């Protein structure tokens, strides 16, 4: 990891763009108007309806939704409704005479759902909340975060007709619900309120600010006089769940002498990160840039799938010049996925094999994986991708590791220096053919790099080519092909028989409608014995695409993160099995000692006429399995001779139940309030103890954590005995294949 000084010398700026948004927006703006209809707002009936009517007249091309909230929440006017129907809809706004309830939280969630289903992030969204400054439902916490979207602005109009509450108090109360958002009093002049809100003018005390400055703002509206450069705070790749630290450099452009004190650069919050505001404390002159490190906090508690779906492609910021409030200067910082790969770090080598029919996108998917580690914008091709149907482009096994790819480069980008803890290898293969060997040979490392399709020879096991996880890439078109589905199902069963969890990547899904895709996921995917949590929709890069798209990169990262997680689990399981094997070996030796049979000193694998264990017992599980299979096929020894020549398997010696793999969902809770810090899924064996599961979880979260400070509980709070096996615990769950537990920090007693 670079020190800060080294980092400053080698840092690379993220792509940043700034544009000026004129007050007369040429595009369609989506207005969401939330109206409190409690008795506290009844006197504003006419003012509110006039405000909405004039807002529509001032924005002819806008889309409007109106939601009322009191003791109930209702949408009285929807997006895409005919504009001439607005007048009749306004009659449905009814204010209560005595009810003071205001379910603002529920209204904002309804607003968010309506926006998300109708609105694109390329368009402008403006939310206007007309309120007395109260929220009476429990869901009112973090209201602004619910509506955190790119290109989205929130405004507040505060009023209250209670004799003991002034408009200033109402503004203060509403401002506490909408921190960092613009809130003004609801006045008697709707036109002025619209101008103040939409044009960035001051509050009621300086309401003429926007209009007064209009005549002198033309030169500022053409070009933004501020240059902004944004750098990652460190060149080390971080977890996608970490807070985002950015170094922001602000300076005047070449045509501007200075940037005035009081200028604000607001980095807007979104569904993934919190916001941040930089305010200049003094005038910024040319040649003396200002730099500040900002922290955008990761919003904890997101589920794994939602977490990746919410990850933003860019961070939106607004520039509010102290001497030009008439125009909004808007910009964005494009995020680079290579700085968010920390979840892929592992102390084990993770080898991932990709399988599927010809032309389904296997090699393209692998190229997507590798390009995650390419911080440059242009795509690179490491695996030969099939651009036609019916022709094998990949005709031999191609094993490539990240370390090999990076070592072949003449120049290493600074962030690539931090990939040393990421040890991933990929294995590309030809499309399924009838003469394919079983996948267990690939899992054992018996199919080596360079093996040709027509000369597939099973060789001695080599750890360099051992496959830890299999991803099946399936085109959406293949779900209607019975022969293809039969081959895929056969291969998936081969993986399941090895107690390896298969992953499914569905490609070319853009050829179906949303309803058609849901139908395939519900009816067809279920037939393949792959859990829904292990099924991924992947939008592969096409031949015409030459530059990276972070929305696609996030899909690749989510799939690769799951694959690496499964590889870690498998490697942990293999190590545990080896430890158990050695332990069982010691038990066997101790049992022999009671027979007082003399044992000669000899090398570990050397046979002895007086020693009962045969050399075969010390061989690898793969060799042992093959020998047992061969023996079974050639002879059928009597029970007495079999027990005398072959020691019992370790599981029988310890009287353990047959192991199976289950899916465990874990909520991490750090305080007594029960707030879930994060949630994730992990594969576990039923033969694992609660203690082993806890240690594995802590190793995944933070190896520096003290395991003694944590306990595993059920959702009800029941603490599980650490010596208990998962096989006994799952009996109390309705679904023994998938259970949910809690990793909870123990509370100290004083």
Swiss-Prot record:
Residues 586-657 are annotated as: Disordered. One of its GO terms (cellular component) is membrane raft. Residues 17-249 form the VWFA domain. Residues 586-595, 603-645 have a biased composition (Low complexity). One of its GO terms (biological process) is positive regulation of gene expression. SUPFAM superfamilies: P-loop containing nucleoside triphosphate hydrolases, vWA-like. PANTHER family: INTERFERON-INDUCED PROTEIN 44 (PTHR14241), VWFA DOMAIN-CONTAINING PROTEIN-RELATED (PTHR14241:SF32). This is von Willebrand factor A domain-containing protein DDB_G0292188. It comes from Dictyostelium discoideum. The lineage of its organism: Eukaryota, Amoebozoa, Evosea, Eumycetozoa, Dictyostelia.
């Amino acid at each position: 990891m670079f020190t800060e000084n080294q980092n400053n010398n080698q840092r690379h700026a993220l792509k940043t763009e700034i544009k000026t948004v004129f007050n007369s927006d040429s595009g369609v703006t989506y207005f969401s108007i939330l109206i409190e209809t409690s008795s506290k707002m009844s006197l504003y009936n006419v003012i509110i309806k006039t405000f909405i009517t004039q807002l529509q007249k001032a924005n002819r091309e806008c889309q409007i939704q109106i939601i009322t909230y009191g003791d109930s929440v209702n949408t009285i006017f929807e997006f895409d409704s005919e504009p001439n129907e607005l007048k009749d809809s306004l009659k449905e706004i009814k204010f209560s005479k005595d009810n003071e309830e205001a379910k603002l939280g529920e209204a904002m969630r309804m607003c968010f759902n309506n926006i998300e289903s109708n609105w694109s992030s390329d368009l402008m969204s403006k939310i206007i909340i007309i309120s007395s400054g109260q929220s009476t439902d429990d869901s009112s916490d973090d209201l602004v975060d619910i509506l955190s979207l790119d290109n989205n602005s929130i405004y507040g109009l505060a009023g209250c007709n209670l004799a003991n509450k002034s408009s200033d108090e109402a503004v203060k109360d509403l401002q506490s619900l909408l921190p960092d958002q613009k809130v003004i009093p609801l006045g008697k002049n709707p036109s002025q309120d619209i101008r103040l809100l939409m044009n960035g003018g001051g509050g009621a005390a300086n309401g003429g600010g926007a209009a007064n400055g209009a005549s002198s703002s033309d030169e500022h509206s053409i070009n933004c006089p501020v240059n902004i450069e944004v750098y990652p705070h460190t060149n080390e790749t971080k977890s996608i769940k970490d807070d985002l630290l950015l170094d922001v450099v602000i300076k005047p452009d070449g045509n501007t002498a200075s940037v005035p004190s009081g200028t604000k650069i607001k980095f807007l919050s979104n569904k993934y990160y919190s916001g941040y505001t930089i305010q200049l404390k003094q005038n910024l002159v040319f040649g003396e840039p200002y730099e500040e490190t900002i922290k955008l906090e990761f919003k904890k508690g997101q589920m794994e799938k939602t977490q990746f779906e919410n990850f933003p492609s860019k961070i939106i910021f607004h520039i509010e010049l102290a001497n030009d409030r008439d125009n909004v200067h808007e910009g964005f910082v494009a995020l680079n996925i290579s700085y968010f790969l920390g979840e892929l770090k592992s102390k084990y080598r993770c080898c991932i094999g990709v399988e599927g029919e010809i032309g389904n996108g296997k090699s393209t998917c692998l190229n997507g994986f590798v390009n995650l580690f390419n911080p440059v914008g242009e795509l690179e091709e490491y695996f030969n991708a099939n651009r036609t149907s019916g022709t094998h482009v990949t005709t031999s096994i191609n094993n490539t590791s990240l370390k090999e790819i990076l070592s072949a480069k003449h120049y290493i980008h600074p962030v690539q220096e931090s990939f040393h803890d990421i040890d991933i290898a990929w294995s590309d293969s030809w499309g399924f053919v009838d003469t394919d060997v079983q996948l267990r040979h690939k899992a054992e490392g018996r199919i080596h790099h360079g093996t040709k399709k027509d000369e597939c020879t099973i060789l001695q096991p080599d750890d360099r080519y051992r496959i830890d996880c299999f991803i099946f890439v399936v085109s959406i078109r293949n779900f209607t092909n019975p022969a293809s589905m039969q081959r895929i199902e056969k291969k998936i069963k081969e993986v399941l028989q090895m107690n390896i969890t298969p992953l499914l990547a569905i490609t070319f899904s853009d050829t179906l409608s949303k309803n058609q895709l849901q139908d395939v996921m519900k009816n067809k995917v279920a037939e393949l014995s792959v859990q829904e949590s292990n099924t991924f929709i992947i939008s592969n890069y096409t031949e015409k695409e030459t530059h990276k798209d972070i929305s696609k990169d996030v899909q690749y990262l989510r799939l690769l993160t799951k694959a690496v997680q499964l590889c870690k689990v498998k490697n942990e399981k293999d190590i545990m099995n080896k430890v158990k094997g050695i332990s069982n070996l010691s038990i066997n030796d101790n049992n022999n000692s009671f027979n007082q049979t003399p044992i000669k000193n000899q090398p570990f694998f050397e046979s002895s006429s007086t020693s009962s264990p045969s050399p075969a017992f010390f061989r690898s599980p793969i060799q042992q399995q093959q020998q047992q299979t061969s023996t079974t096929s050639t002879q059928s020894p009597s029970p007495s001779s079999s027990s005398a020549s072959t020691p019992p398997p370790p599981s029988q010696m310890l009287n353990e139940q047959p192991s199976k793999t289950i899916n465990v969902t874990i909520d991490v809770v750090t305080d007594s309030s029960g707030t879930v810090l994060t949630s994730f899924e992990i594969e576990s064996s039923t033969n694992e103890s609660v203690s082993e599961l806890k240690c594995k979880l802590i190793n995944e979260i933070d190896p520096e954590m003290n395991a003694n400070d944590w306990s595993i509980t059920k959702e009800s709070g029941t603490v599980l005995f650490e010596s208990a096996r998962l096989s006994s615990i799952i009996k109390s769950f309705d679904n023994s294949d998938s259970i949910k537990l809690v990793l909870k920090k123990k509370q100290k007693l004083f």
